[in-house]
Each structure stands twice: as C-alpha cells, then as structure tokens.
C-alpha cells in the first residue's frame, strides 16, 4: 500500500512538472509570436478595475487601522491626564466628587468609542478587503487555464497537421483540448460575472464605513462636549473659591507663542460678555467679570442722571453769576469804551498787524462806539445825528452753556480796549450814546480823511454769532435812566481828547510818518469840512420795547485816504 501511494505521488508530481513545462513552453512561443494567445477584452477591463479596487481598499484599510491605533493612544493619554488631575485635586477644593464622575465617564466614553470604531469601521473594511485574495487566486487560476487551453489547442493543431496521422494521438489531443476549454470557459464566465459586482460593491462599503465613523464621532464628541462643560464648571467653581489666586503667563517670548491669552475652551451664555478684555493675561473667572459688568451697567444710568443734575445746577449758577456780572460790568465797561471817535480812529488799518501796532503806540487811544462820533477837536457835533442801536436778540446768545463763563469778562485796561465779543445778555454796551445835542453836536466824521458808515459792515471786522439758547431776561430800564447812567459814566478825559493825541495815532501808521505840524493843519481842514457830511450819520431813538438797535459789528469803519497826506 505504501508503495502504491508513493508511486501515485510520484506520478502526480511528474504530471505537475509536465504541466509547468508545457505552460512555460507555450508562453515562450506566444512571446516569440509562434503561437496564438487567446485574449478577452471584457475580462481584462474587469481585471484592471479589480486591481485598482484592491489597491484602494488596502490603502483605506491601512489608514483605518492607523486611525484606530491613534484613538487607542489618545484614550490612554486622556486616561492618564484625567487620573493625574484626580490625584492632584485636593479634597478640600470644590467639585472634588464631581471630578471623579467626570474622569470615570471620560474613560468609559473613550473605551466605547474605541470598541465601536474597531467593530463598525475597521472590521467591516477588513471583511471587504479579505475577499480580494480569493478573487485574485481565481484570476491567477484563470490565467493558468488559459495557457493550458492555448497549449492544448496548439498541440491539437500540430497533430492534425502532421504528415503521418495517428488516430489515437489525434483523439487524445482533442479530448485534452475539450477538457482545457471547458475548465477555462467556466472559470472565465464566473469571473466575468463576479468582478463587476465586486467592483460596484466598493461604493456601498465606503458609505457604510464612513456613516458608521461619522455617527460614532458625533455621539462621541457630543458626549465629550458635555463632559468638557462639566469639567469647565468644576474649574470655574474652583476659581471662584480661590479668586485671589491669579495665574499670569510670563517668561515666554512673543516669537515662541502666537498668543499670550489663555482663552476658555468652552463659551457659554452665562460667561460671555462683550466687555471682557481679550488681551488680559490673567485667567480670571468670566462669570465674575460678567457680574461686575452687569453691576457697572446698573450704575451707569444713576451716574448719567447725576451728571445731568450737576449740569443743571452749574447752568443755574452760571445764570446767577451772569446776572450779577452784567450789572457790575455795565458800569465797568463804560470806562474803556468811551463815545469818542476821532479822525485817527476813523482810519482803518490795511491789515490786522497795523491795527495791533496802532493800539500799542497809543495806549491812551479810545475805542470808537458804533454810533457816536466826535469832531477832531474833541467837541460833540452841533447837528443832531441819529444813532440806531439795538440789543442782541435771544438767538444771538452764547453758543453753548459751557461757553458762558468765557463771555463774562472784566473791564479791560484803558490802554487796550477789549475786542468786540458776542455777549450773552442784552445789556447795553458801553458805546451806547443817548440822543442828546451834546453827544451829537460838533464836527462830523465825514471829512476826506474818514467817514463812518453805519449801514455797511466791513467784511474784515464783521462778527457773526451763531444762534444760541435764550439768556435770562434782564430788568427793563427806562431811557431816562440809561441816559443818566451813560452821562455819569462817561469820562471827560476820554470825551475830550486833544487833537495831538488823535493825530498821533495816524502818525504811528507805517507809510503815514508826517510831522506833527502837518497833522494839526489836516485836523483844521477836517473840522472845516465836517459840516459837509453831517447827513451820513442819523441818530434816532427807538422807544419800542426799550431796545436800542445798532449795527452788530463794533468796528465797522470805512475810510478813504486823504489825498493831502
């Protein structure tokens, strides 16, 4: 029996060697072109798709295994960090028991995620890839059977084409050819049916695997987010318990870190605040910051109301001070603003610098009033001129309540008269002159040297005051009281200025440097021609509403150069 088995094994081995030899011989003949090779384009396309599918499947399977390995590593790392936190967390701190539950749930969640990922993703891909080896073997077997089929066909053709025909050999060659053809065609037909199905199954495999992965991630991250919220709340309680202990990031250069801010990992509605500083280096509790912000917001309306009350009080105090200052300044401002208007003041300076130099040269010169005019000799004009003076309306008050303090001014020194300013109260200016024969008599400033136009305003000296809130009303004074007050307040020295002082102002102007004798002669000529222009100033008292109307600018002077100078 043993000898029979050994002989059978030797015969099988010899048969296999003979097949391999015949196959190798056939392949050589096919490569040399001496034998015809059978080809199936449909199968070749399916085989090409299979090899591509196999490569993609093995790559995805390899990446999934690496992903699972990374999850395992992350599980172990997270577990060690949680255990270390639990060890260093003192039992006296708030949230000690809650931290234990968080650590245990964290480990359980990672373990569940790892197991389900390995079962629903990696193992599924492993089953999908396992079928490639079987199909690959069948494709290889089909290739061998194809060579056997080609070899049997070539042998049959050789026997049939031999010169000496042998019926036994021909019958045996036909039998082998039919057998090889049947095996090859059956295997080829199976592969032609299975390969396209396997190739299309890759879509369902990918869908199933990544649906499982996405679902597992969603569940895992949702549960992990809850644990993170719980852990953040525990840390917030601990921070609130020890709010005086602040950790500041320091000792690190800006190049080694992109940001020095320790931001919270979780943003909740209770801790979010628009007023928190994004650049604060400390990790103070956001809840405490939101509470402080809400407290400041509650105090903000009270502070704003207090500021409004303080502003109202300041306005009332300013109005009282203005009332007292207006009564005191009405008599004080009369001294530096007399009603004397000599020929020297009638000449306007070409530039602002000339006007400043004129005031510096003649410290004793007076400011001309808008409506009054005197002759060069200092005597009032004999003809009754009419001056129309008016007080400022309520809309011409101060621009803002805060500017009222700057409007209340004291009397300027006699050497430099104050410039015209917008007054907030309707008090009469110091240049208001009652219509009396003494104030309007004498010479008229309509000489060739100077002419005063009450109707036209110089664009350089005109003042524009924007409308403002209405100032408090002042007690109405009768024209007789104003007249007596202005008469008593006038300075006789200022009203009667010598012609030498009047003309010295003209001499101080650059380009008008003349001798004093020529100026006296000019003054005589001006007094002689003063009667020609008495009609240019008409003074009329407006008794209505007890308001004196006058041109608003106080320095509206238009002059013409004397051709004799």
Curated annotation (Swiss-Prot):
The modification Phosphothreonine is found at residue 438. Residues 267-296, 422-451 have a biased composition (Low complexity). It comes from the Eukaryota. Detected in natural killer cells (at protein level). Highest level expression seen in spleen and peripheral blood leukocytes and is also expressed at high levels in thymus, colon and placenta, suggesting preferential expression in hematopoietic tissues. Residues 471-486, 511-524 have a biased composition (Basic and acidic residues). Its main location: cytoplasm. One of its GO terms (cellular component) is ficolin-1-rich granule lumen. Changing residue 13 to A: Strongly reduces binding to membranes. The keyword Coiled coil applies. Residues 267-565 are annotated as: Disordered. InterPro entries: AH/BAR_dom_sf, Amphiphysin, BAR_Bin2, BAR_dom, Bin2_C. GO terms for molecular function: phospholipid binding. Residues 28-244 form the BAR domain. It is found in: Cytoplasm; Cell projection, Podosome membrane; Cytoplasm, Cell cortex; Cell projection, Phagocytic cup. Changing residue 21 to A: Strongly reduces binding to membranes. Keywords: Cell junction, Cell membrane, Cell projection, Coiled coil, Cytoplasm, Membrane, Phosphoprotein. It is a peripheral membrane protein. Induction: Up-regulated during monocytic differentiation. GO terms for biological process: cell chemotaxis; phagocytosis, engulfment; plasma membrane tubulation; podosome assembly. The keyword Membrane applies. The modification Phosphoserine is found at residues 273, 357, 383, 395, 436, 440, 444, 447, 451, 458, 462. Residues 304-329 form a coiled coil. The BAR domain mediates dimerization and interaction with membranes enriched in phosphatidylinositides. Homodimer. Interacts with BIN1. Interacts with ARHGEF6 (via SH3 domain), ARHGEF7 (via SH3 domain), SH3GL1, SH3GL2 and SH3GL3. Identified in a complex with ARHGEF6 and GIT2. Promotes cell motility and migration, probably via its interaction with the cell membrane and with podosome proteins that mediate interaction with the cytoskeleton. Modulates membrane curvature and mediates membrane tubulation. Plays a role in podosome formation. Inhibits phagocytosis. This is Bridging integrator 2. It comes from Homo sapiens. The lineage of its organism: Eukaryota, Metazoa, Chordata, Craniata, Vertebrata.
């Amino acid at each position: 029996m043993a000898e029979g088995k050994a002989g059978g094994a030797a015969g099988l081995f010899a048969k296999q060697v003979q097949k391999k030899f015949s196959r190798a011989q056939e392949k050589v003949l096919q490569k040399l072109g001496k034998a015809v090779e059978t080809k199936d384009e449909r199968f070749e396309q399916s085989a090409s798709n299979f090899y591509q599918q196999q490569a993609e499947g093995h790559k995805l399977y390899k990446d999934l295994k690496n992903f699972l390995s990374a999850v395992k590593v992350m599980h172990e790392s997270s577990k060690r960090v949680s255990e270390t936190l639990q060890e260093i967390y003192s039992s006296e701190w708030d949230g000690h028991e809650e931290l234990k539950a968080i650590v245990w749930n964290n480990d359980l969640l990672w373990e569940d995620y790892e197991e389900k990922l390995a079962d629903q993703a990696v193992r599924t891909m492993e089953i999908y890839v396992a079928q490639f080896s079987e199909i690959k073997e069948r494709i290889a077997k089909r290739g061998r059977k194809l060579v056997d089929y080609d070899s049997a066909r070539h042998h049959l053709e050789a026997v049939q084409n031999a010169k000496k025909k042998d019926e036994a050999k021909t019958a045996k060659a036909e039998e082998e050819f039919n057998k090889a053809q049947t095996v090859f065609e059956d295997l080829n037909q199976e592969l032609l049916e299975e390969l396209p199905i396997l190739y299309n199954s890759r879509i369902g495999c990918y869908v199933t695997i990544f649906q499982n992965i996405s679902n597992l991630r969603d569940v895992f991250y949702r549960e992990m987010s809850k644990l993170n919220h719980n852990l953040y709340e525990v840390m917030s309680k601990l921070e609130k318990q020890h709010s005086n202990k602040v950790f500041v990031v320091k000792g690190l250069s800006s190049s080694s870190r992109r940001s020095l801010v320790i931001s919270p990992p979780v943003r909740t509605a209770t801790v979010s605040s628009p007023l928190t500083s994004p650049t604060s280096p400390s990790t103070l509790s956001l809840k405490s910051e939101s509470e402080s912000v809400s407290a400041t917001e509650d105090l903000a309306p009270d502070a704003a109301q207090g500021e409004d009350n303080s502003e109202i009080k300041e306005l009332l105090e300013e109005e009282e001070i203005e009332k007292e200052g207006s009564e005191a300044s009405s008599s004080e401002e009369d001294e530096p603003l007399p009603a004397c208007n000599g020929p020297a003041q009638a000449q306007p300076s070409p530039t602002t610098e000339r006007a400043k130099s004129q005031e510096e040269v003649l410290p004793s010169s007076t400011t001309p009033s808008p409506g009054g005019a005197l002759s060069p000799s200092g005597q009032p004009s004999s003809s009754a001129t009419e001056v129309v003076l008016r007080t400022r309306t309520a809309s011409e008050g101060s621009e803002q309540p805060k500017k009222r303090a700057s409007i209340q001014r004291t009397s300027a020194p006699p050497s430099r008269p104050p410039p015209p300013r917008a007054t907030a109260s309707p008090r009469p200016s110091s240049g208001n002159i009652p219509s009396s024969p003494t104030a309007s008599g004498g010479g008229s400033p309509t000489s060739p040297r100077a002419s005063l136009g009450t109707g036209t305003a110089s664009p350089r000296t005109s003042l524009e005051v924007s409308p403002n809130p209405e100032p408090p009303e002042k007690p109405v004074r009768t024209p007789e009281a104003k007249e007596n007050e202005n008469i008593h307040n006038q300075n006789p020295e200022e009203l009667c200025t010598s012609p030498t002082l009047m003309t010295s102002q003209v001499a101080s102007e650059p380009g008008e440097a003349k001798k004093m004798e020529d100026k006296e002669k000019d003054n005589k000529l001006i007094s002689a021609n003063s009667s020609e222009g008495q009609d240019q100033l008409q003074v009329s008292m407006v008794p209505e509403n007890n308001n004196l109307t006058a041109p608003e600018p106080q320095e509206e002077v238009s002059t013409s150069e004397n051709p004799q100078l």
